Amino acid sequence: MLTTKKTFQTKFLSTLLILALVSTMILAPTALAAGFGGSSITTAVADSGARNFTPTEAANDTEIQAMTDNRSVLNESDIIYMILTDRFYDADPTNNGTLNQEYRPGQLKYTQGGDWKGITQKLDYIKNLGVTAIWISPPSQNELLSRDGEESGYHGYFTHDYNSADPHFGTKQDLIDLVSAAHSKGLKVILDVVPNHTADYFNGASSTYSSASYQPAAPFNNPDWYHHYGDITDWNNEYQVLNYDLGGLDDLNQDNADARQAIKDAYKNWITLTGADGIRVDAARSMPKNFLQEFESYVGVPSFGEIFVGDVDYVSAFSNYEWGVLDFPLFFQAREVFAHDASFTTVKAIFDQDYKYANVNHLITFIDNHDRDRF
């Protein structure tokens, strides 16, 4: 099922490239104002003969096709700079939020002020790193605070309103301007998307809200659009993985036709509005594979999914349903080799299973991200 395949040597060199780039960033200042915080680098290396994704493969929608002149095509040669928007650069203090509520400078579980204007101002810096694309935090409006008040949705994964921009990042026009400015400098833009869950609004496994005034924005305030089984407690139980809540976050039911359509429409609208070039799908493991395939096709840009598992057989199964996947199996083994003196044969064992992927050139390799401690 594989027509092109990275050699062990090529993929190993790409890993060394990531190590060099990330090491440079770790040595750089981490102050938010300096524009270095909240970011890391991933890469996908090109192989001759590899298939490039084109918009016509995903959708024939006239509106999306009309935008192709302004959109670059995400491909295997891209080096991606990941930005946690809130932690990057604060160019507009007026959108930081309420002091001592969601905005608490220096307290890392709360908003710190980074915004889309901040990324736009630092595009020359990013371009000079030698990267070709940026992957930014989810754009949708997040819940200000978790139910217990112990953290904010600074990261973008506590979705409140799928169809509105998070005011802490800026306006929709600010995001449009960011994508346009990035394109003018030859940089592609990847939006993180969260179709699996909203913030935590329901009482455990109940279909009742914890408060009548604390619920997601319409139309996602319909309890019938959700599973109500409580939290995942057994990650080896696939039924739980697909239908239970991830860390308390309310699990959307993609098998509900109305919910499914609303999710697809929300993100297609973001892509159409901004002209972004691709999407990274959060918690892809926790959604039906047929939904992931349909979602990518409908939105109309290539997607790569987060399957937070080190097993090649498990992760590679998703490669038939999305343009690409994050290479978590390599991530786990590379860290063991370079940080804990494990044998290089463990990395080779990962490379030897490349044939299991639909297109090994669409693996997004990395050793550092926003879900893990710095390498």
What is each PLM-predicted segment?
Residues 12-20:
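Sec-dependent signal peptide hydrophobic core
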Residues 1-9:
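N-terminal secretory signal peptides that target proteins for export/translocation
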Residues 23-46:
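Sec-dependent signal peptide cleavage junction
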Residues 8, 12-13, 25:
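Subset of Sec-pathway N-terminal targeting signals
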Residues 91-107, 111, 348, 357-375:
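Loop/helix patches that line or flank the sugar-binding groove of alpha-linked glycan CAZymes
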